[in-house]
Amino acid sequence: LKADRLYMENRIEIQNAVAHMVQRGKKHISFAGDKNHCQSFFERYMAYKDAVEHFGLTEGLSTCAMPSGQQNYPVSLYETIRRFKTMPDAFVCANDFVAMDLVKALNELGYSVPDDIWVCGFDDSQEASYFAPHLTSIHIHGQIMGYTAANLLMTRIEEPSLNYRTVYTETNLILREST
C-alpha cells in the first residue's frame, strides 16, 4: 500500500516489561494473545520473544497462550492455560482485554494475580486502571497519535509528491498492582 503509515512503538516497552519481570525474579514468562490477529499483536509477540531469548528464558515460549480465530476468546484462553503442565510466573499480553480475560481465567483456576502470577497488558485502556487488580500496562499516547496522523495528512495534502513515511509514536510502561 502506497501511503503514509502511523504505528505505536510496540517493541521497546514490551522488552522493558520483560526486563522488569526478570529483575524481580520472574523466570518463566509467557505471552497471551493471538499473534496473528493484527500487525501490532505480531510485533508485540516478537518483542516478547526477543526479550525472553535475550535473557535466556526460553521456557516461557513453550507455554504461550495464543488461541486464534476463536469466537469465544475468554473460554478458549481459559481452556488453553488450563492444560499447561507448568504455569508461568508472568505473562505479557497482546492488549489489556486479553490481560483482563487472562486474570479472570487464572482466578477461576485458583491463581492470584499478582501473588502467584504477574500480568502485563498493552494499550493502557481506561478499564485497565479500574480492573482489580489494577493492570500494569503499556500506555499508548492517543492524543499524540491523533496529532501525528493529522500532521501526516496535512503534509501529504500540501506536498503529495513527498516520499511515503512510516512514523512510530512512543509508548510507556505503567506499573500497577498486577506486577
Predicted segments, located by residue:
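Bacterial carbohydrate/catabolite-sensing allosteric modules
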Residues: L1-T179
